[in-house]
Amino acid sequence: LLHRNLIASLTASLFCIPVAHASSDDSCNPPAALRQNAYSCGGMPILSPANDTRINAMLLMVDSGQLAQLFPDPKTIPPKDRVNRIVVPFSYDFSGWIDIGQKQPDTTGNASNANAPSNQYADGEGSICRSMTAGADAFGAALNAAKDLPGDEAARLRAARADIAQKTCASGGASAAWTKPSVKSPIGQQFATYLDGTNAFYRFDFPAATKAFAGASHSANPWLKETGLYMAGRAQLNAAQANAFDHDSPTPSRESVAKVSLDAANTVFRTYLKVYPQGRYAGSASGLLRRVAWLGGNVAQQADLYDKAFAHWSPTVSNVPLMQLANELDSKLVFAPGFDPRQIQSPAVLATVDLMRMRTSDSTDSSRDKPLTLGELQAQKPRFAGTPALYDYLLATWYVYVGHKPAAALDLLPQASGAPLDYFGLSQQALRAFALEDSGQPDKARQLWRDLIPLAKLRFQREALELALAINLEQAGLVDEAFADDSPIQNAAIRATLLQRAANADLLRAQAQNKSTSGTLRDIALYTLLYKEFTRAHYADFVTDVTLVSDAPSDALKPFAQPGAKNEDGYVCPSARDIAAALQQNPADAKGMNCLADFVRRHPAESGLGEYSLPSWAAAGAPPASAAHVPPTLGSAPSQFKGKSFERMPGYVAVMDDAQANPNDRAYALYRAIKCYAPSGYNDCGGKDVPKNTRKRWFNTLKAAYPGSQWAQTLKYYW
C-alpha cells in the first residue's frame, strides 16, 4: 500500500515525479506534460486517457468547486521549495493524500479520517464489530432523549448494551450467554426488543436480529423507528453474504449469496432512504446499497449508485472519504472480474471506462486489453442522450488520442466562453489546444493557452495551463517568451526546467542578472550558463561571465569560485577561470583538458542539466508506429545552447595521444581513463566504449612508460 508522504528529489520533482501505483509499492515517473497517451501515475486536472480511472471519476462526477477544495493549494508549498515542484502532474495516493510538496496539515479531528464513525462502511459491511462502539454511544444518547423512560430502566438498558459488547465482540466473549434486561414500561420494552436484535446481530443470528429490529422499527420513538429499520437492512445484508466469501477472498461467490436476503436488504435500504432521505444513516445505507448491487452482480445498478454517490458526495454526510469512494469504484466495478461495460447506463461511469480504453497500450497496462473502437463509441450515443457535451468530448478525445484526426475533434469542441472554467470546461479547451497543435496550428494553440490562463480559478488549473503553454513555446523555439515581463508562466519549477534544458546563453545571462526574479532562479540561470559554457568550449564567455558569481555564492556556484588546488590523487589544477583561459588560448592544452575533466568528475552537472536523451528509434531515423504520436514533454526539445557537451573519456584519449604533452599529464590521463571503468567494468566517462584489451594496454603503458609517477605506483588493477 502507498505511504502517505511521497518525497521527491529536486530533479525528480521537476521532471519525473516518483509516485506509487495505487495497488503496489512500485514507483513510476510521469512525464512533465499535460498531454499523455499511456497510463500515468501522475494526475492531471483534465479528463485524460492517461489519468488513473479514480482521478477521472472524480473530475467527471464531483462538483468542481467541491473537488477543488480537496486538492491541496499550491500556495501552501513553502516558497523555498517552489522551484522544485512543478505541481501538475501531481502525485497522489488513495489514502486520500495528494502530494505537491505542500505543508502537511494537522489531521487531528479531520473529517476525512477513515476511522471516523461516518466512514465505518467504506468498503461495505466488513466486520460487524466495527460499529459496536459507535452503536453503543448512539444507544446511550437515545436513552437519554427518550421520554417516559424511568431512570432505573435506562440504567439497566445501558448496562445490558455494554454487556452485549463484552459477550460478543470482546475477545473470547462470543459464547457467553446474555440476559435480556427486565423492564416494565412500554418504551423500555421497545428498547429491550432492540437489544434483542443487537445481541442476535453481533452473534451472527441474522434471522433473529431481523425480526427484533423490525419489531423495534414500529416504535413511536423516533430513534428506535429509524435505527430499527436501518439495522433490519444490515441484518439482511449480512445474512445474504454470510457464505459468499471463501478463504478471505475479496471476490464473492455469487452462487453462494442468499438472494432472498439480498433482495430484502435492497428493499429495506431503499425504503429507509425514501422515508429518511437526510437520515442519520443515509450515507451508510447508500453505501450498503452499492454493496447489495455488487453482491448481486448488477453492474447497471452499481454504476447508477456510484454516479449518485459521487455527485452528492459531501465530507459531512457521505459514508466514505471521496478517494475511498474512488477506490471502491475501481475495485468493485471497473476492475471487478467479468466486468462488462455494455451494461452501464450511467454516462459518467461509462465515460470513465471509455477514457481508460483510449490509452496507448504498454506492457504493464492491463486496462487496455480491449481498446475502444470508433464503432463502439458511436453505438453508445443513446446512453449519452442526456449529456451530449460529454459524448462530444469523448468522441473528440478518440479522434485526438486514437484516430489522429484533429480536424474532426475541432468540429466537436466548443469555443471558450470567457467565463471561469470548471474542470470539464478546462478539459474541453485543453483538448481543443491539443487538436490545434496536432493539425499544424501551434500558434493558434499557443494563443488559446494564453487566453485560458486568466479563466483558471480552481486549483491546479493554472499550473496545468502554464505547463502546456511552456511546452508549446519550447517546441516552437520561443523560450524567451516564457521569461518576458508579461509572461503568464510564473511557476518557478517550469521556469527552472526551461532554463536548465532549453535556454540559450543570452537568455541565461539575462536571467542570471534579472533582479525581478527570485534569487534561486538567478542562481539556476547562472549555474546553467557557467556549466554549459565551461563544458561546451565557450571559454571566452566563461571567463567573462564567471565574474557574475558573488562573493558569497550558493553551494552550486562555489566550484566556479574556488582557487586552484591539489586533488585527492595529487594532481594540481588551477581555478576554473584559469582552466578556461588556458583552453581559450589552446583548446588542446593537455593540463587544461585534464583539469576540465577533473572539474566534471568532481562536480558533475546537476541532474536537471542533462541533455534530453532521444529514444533509440529517434537516433535511427523514423519512429515506429507506436511512437509516432508521442506528445512532447517539458524540456524535451533540443537545447538552444550551442555546442556539444564535454565528455571525459575523449579528453583523456586526446591527452594520451598528444606527443607534446607533459609526461605527468599523460600519465594522469592514462590513470583516469583506466579508472573510468572502476569498479563495475562499465564506462562512466562518456564517449565510445573502450575494449578491455585496450584498457589492458593502457595499464601496461602507464606502468612501463611512467614507472616513477605516483599514479603508476598506486594503480593496482585495470577493469
Residue ranges and their predicted role:
Residues 8-17:
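Bacterial N-terminal signal peptides
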Residues 1-8:
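Bacterial N-terminal signal peptides that target proteins for export
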Residues 21-210, 219-719:
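Alpha-helical solenoid repeat scaffolds
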